[in-house]
Amino acid sequence: MLALTFAMSGIAYLLGSVSNAVLISRLCDLPDPREYGSHNPGATNVLRSGNRLAALIVFLLDMLKGTIPVYLAWYLGIPPLYLGFIGIAACLGHMYPLYFHFRGGKGVATALGALLPLGLDMGSFMIVTWLIVLLFTGYSSLAAIGAALLAPLYTYCLKPEYTLPVAMLCCLIILRHHENISRLLQGHEPQVWSRHPLKRHRR
């Protein structure tokens, strides 16, 4: 079982390393999301380009990077604790992608996707938390941090066997937001609906 867990973790990392924000931006003739806005290759920053459809596609594909390996591992009978580590591997791939010089995103959508096979209730609580904070503040980063802070509590109440890996994953997500936290404290963090002047992508 341990060998299978390592193999699935490797697959999860490689799948997570696919930077959908960069690829979809190229397909839609949008600028590289690493070069404008928050410089984060994720759905929120793609949304700042003004292309909502592209942002939605990126969000869904990033979620699938977490859902697919964790669901396959669950189907293969891998124990709960190891399922959590496979989800972490997918998020590490998103954060430090092998194919894109290790310049990745924050891992929020991928983490959410990884939680869905573990329980729709946990995923739903995280989505609701994220939406509430976003609607009240307008900051996607603050919404992600709020959801990450509460996710271990939700997990402990609903699926306690997953608490440790979920807590580890949430710590990783919060650490990845250290620049956002600094900008929030300084009042320089862009809101999710703020648009940035963009240059056309050069082929």
From Swiss-Prot:
It is an enzyme of class 2 (transferase). One of its GO terms (biological process) is phospholipid biosynthetic process. GO terms for molecular function: acyl-phosphate glycerol-3-phosphate acyltransferase activity. It comes from the Bacteria. The chain crosses the membrane at residues 4-24, 68-88, 104-124, 125-145. Its main location: membrane. It catalyses: an acyl phosphate + sn-glycerol 3-phosphate = a 1-acyl-sn-glycero-3-phosphate + phosphate. The keyword Transmembrane applies. Pathway: Lipid metabolism; phospholipid metabolism. Keywords: Cell inner membrane, Cell membrane, Lipid biosynthesis, Lipid metabolism, Membrane, Phospholipid biosynthesis, Phospholipid metabolism, Transferase, Transmembrane, Transmembrane helix. It holds the Pfam family G3P_acyltransf. It is found in: Cell inner membrane. Signal peptide: none annotated. It is a multi-pass membrane protein. Probably interacts with PlsX. HAMAP family: PlsY (MF_01043). Catalyzes the transfer of an acyl group from acyl-phosphate (acyl-PO(4)) to glycerol-3-phosphate (G3P) to form lysophosphatidic acid (LPA). This enzyme utilizes acyl-phosphate as fatty acyl donor, but not acyl-CoA or acyl-ACP. Belongs to the PlsY family. This is Glycerol-3-phosphate acyltransferase.
